[in-house]
């Protein structure tokens, strides 16, 4: 399973890359605006850091506008993936962009039916929103599992990005289902490292080592 960071913060991305466990990044205009950064410049900076897929979202909602924006964003870097909303115009844009060799990520997906349309249009990635679905019905993981099963049934090449991930168990459950990718906030990535028994084990090892060194001095 690949791990993407859902952020536009360069320091968070640098840490993830240094740890050697981050395969890509997903962004959106909201995340970039929170950083106070110029949109295209920040996308380029992220691409230079990650050297892997970086999803950048269009803001137009009409077909022509989405295609125009997508073509401009695709010029920033070979790593740019265009995030397109799940709408009729969005799916039409995905079909056009896919034919041009531009990678796409269909976002704001909340049902298996929507995920089928994304795959049929030739999307590179599809992003079901697990946490937001849980907010509505507690069915986020079930939705994700159904999408995995459908994609496996038909051999769709579209990769599934589990999005709106709220906690480590979401990551584990997605992995058990065979999801291709999870995109997670940096805070969730940090929590993946944590377990109380690990902390206790390190504490005991250090205490034993300290005693060993003290005994050597006697």
UniProtKB/Swiss-Prot annotation:
InterPro entries per the UniProt record, alphabetical: Aldolase_TIM (IPR013785), TAL/FSA (IPR001585), Transaldolase_3B (IPR022999), Transaldolase_3B/F6P_aldolase (IPR004731), Transaldolase_AS (IPR018225), TSA/FSA_arc/bac (IPR033919)
Residues forming the catalytic site: 83
Gene3D superfamilies: Aldolase class I
PROSITE patterns given in the database record: TRANSALDOLASE_1 (PS01054), TRANSALDOLASE_2 (PS00958)
Enzyme nomenclature, EC number: 2.2.1.2
UniProt-annotated location(s): Cytoplasm
Any one of the GO CC terms: cytoplasm
Enzyme class at the top of the EC tree: transferase
Keyword entries, A-Z: Cytoplasm, Pentose shunt, Schiff base, Transferase
Pathway stated in the Swiss-Prot or TrEMBL entry: Carbohydrate degradation; pentose phosphate pathway; D-glyceraldehyde 3-phosphate and beta-D-fructose 6-phosphate from D-ribose 5-phosphate and D-xylulose 5-phosphate (non-oxidative stage): step 2/3
Main location group: cytoplasm
Entry keyword annotation includes Hydrolase: no
GO biological process annotation, one example: carbohydrate metabolic process
Any one GO molecular-function label of the UniProt entry: transaldolase activity
Entries under Pfam families matching the protein: TAL_FSA
Reaction equations catalysed: D-sedoheptulose 7-phosphate + D-glyceraldehyde 3-phosphate = D-erythrose 4-phosphate + beta-D-fructose 6-phosphate
Family assignment from sequence similarity: Belongs to the transaldolase family. Type 3B subfamily.
PANTHER family tied to this protein: FRUCTOSE-6-PHOSPHATE ALDOLASE 1-RELATED (PTHR10683:SF40), TRANSALDOLASE (PTHR10683)
Role of this protein: Transaldolase is important for the balance of metabolites in the pentose-phosphate pathway.
HAMAP family: Transaldolase_3b (MF_00494)
Listed name of the protein: Probable transaldolase
Species: Thermotoga sp. (strain RQ2)
């Amino acid at each position: 399973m690949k791990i993407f960071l859902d952020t536009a913060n360069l320091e968070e991305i640098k840490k993830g890359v240094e740890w050697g466990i981050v395969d890509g990044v997903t962004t959106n205009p909201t995340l970039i605006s929170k950083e106070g950064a110029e949109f295209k410049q920040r996308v380029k900076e992220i691409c230079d850091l990650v050297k892997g897929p970086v999803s950048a979202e269009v803001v137009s909602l009409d077909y022509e506008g989405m295609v125009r924006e997508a073509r401009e964003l695709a010029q920033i870097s070979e790593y740019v993936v265009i995030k397109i909303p799940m709408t009729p115009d969005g799916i039409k844009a995905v079909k056009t962009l896919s034919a041009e060799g531009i990678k796409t990520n269909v976002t704001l997906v909340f049902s298996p039916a929507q995920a089928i349309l994304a795959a049929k249009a030739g999307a590179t990635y599809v992003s079901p929103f697990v946490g937001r679905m849980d907010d509505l019905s507690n069915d986020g993981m079930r939705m994700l599992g159904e999408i995995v099963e459908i994609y496996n049934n038909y051999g769709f090449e579209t990769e599934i990005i589990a999005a709106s991930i709220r906690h480590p168990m979401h990551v584990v459950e997605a992995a058990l289902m065979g999801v291709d990718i999870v995109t997670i906030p940096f805070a969730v990535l940090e929590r993946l490292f944590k377990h109380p028994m690990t902390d206790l084990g390190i504490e005991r090892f250090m205490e034993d080592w300290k005693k060993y060194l003290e005994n050597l001095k006697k």
